[in-house]
From Swiss-Prot:
Domain EF-hand per the UniProt entry, residue ranges: 8-43, 44-79, 81-116, 117-149
Family: Belongs to the calmodulin family.
Name under which the protein is recorded: Calmodulin
A molecular-function term among this protein's GO annotations: protein domain specific binding
Ligand binding (Ca(2+) 2): D57, D59, N61, T63, E68
Species name: Triticum aestivum
Example of a GO cellular component annotation carried by this entry: cytoplasm
N-acetylalanine found at: A2
Residues bound to Ca(2+) 3: D94, D96, D98, E105
Residues where Ca(2+) 1 binds: D21, D23, D25, C27, E32
Binding site for Ca(2+) 4: D130, D132, D134, Q136, E141
Function, as annotated: Calmodulin mediates the control of a large number of enzymes, ion channels and other proteins by Ca(2+). Among the enzymes to be stimulated by the calmodulin-Ca(2+) complex are a number of protein kinases and phosphatases.
Miscellaneous field: This protein has four functional calcium-binding sites.
Length: 149
């Protein structure tokens, strides 16, 4: 499954993996998964976190290592119910629910994920996605960016 990913995708997933792997030991625990999900405004139960880990924990050791994470991401990318997932992701970024992701909202979520970005980097991310040039990202623009990944 993961062999269908490009080098660029693998590099991006490695970066995402390290956001989850807070202590840098090469494994994501339920505790680390919970921390990241809560920073994104989700509130999973311990049982839900365990289910998520069990779903991809090929060797059964109770944690997710990078190859297992890659398989999960490859599966998620093939998922056809991505429309609902995209809407959910957009809602996570769109803090005030006004239908737009502002630079401030983008910075807030990225900071919660542990990504310290400069104002220039945040503005650049907005510019890359902002097709109509209004300085913020609407849902259609968000979908375009996410589908291009």
């Amino acid at each position: 499954m993961a062999d269908q990913l490009t080098d660029e995708q693998i590099a991006e997933f490695k970066e995402a993996f390290s956001l989850f792997d807070k202590d840098g030991d090469g494994c994501i625990t339920t505790k680390e998964l919970g921390t990241v999900m809560r920073s994104l405004g989700q509130n999973p139960t311990e049982a839900e976190l365990q289910d998520m880990i069990n779903e991809v924990d090929a060797d059964g050791n109770g944690t997710i290592d990078f190859p297992e994470f890659l398989n999960l991401m490859a599966r998620k990318m093939k998922d056809t119910d991505s429309e609902e997932e995209l809407k959910e992701a957009f809602r996570v970024f769109d803090k005030d629910q006004d239908g737009f992701i502002s630079a401030a909202e983008l910075r807030h979520v990225m900071t919660n994920l542990g990504e310290k970005l400069t104002d220039e980097e945040v503005d650049e991310m907005i510019r890359e996605a902002d097709v109509d040039g209004d300085g913020q990202i609407n849902y259609e623009e968000f979908v375009k960016v996410m589908m291009a990944k």
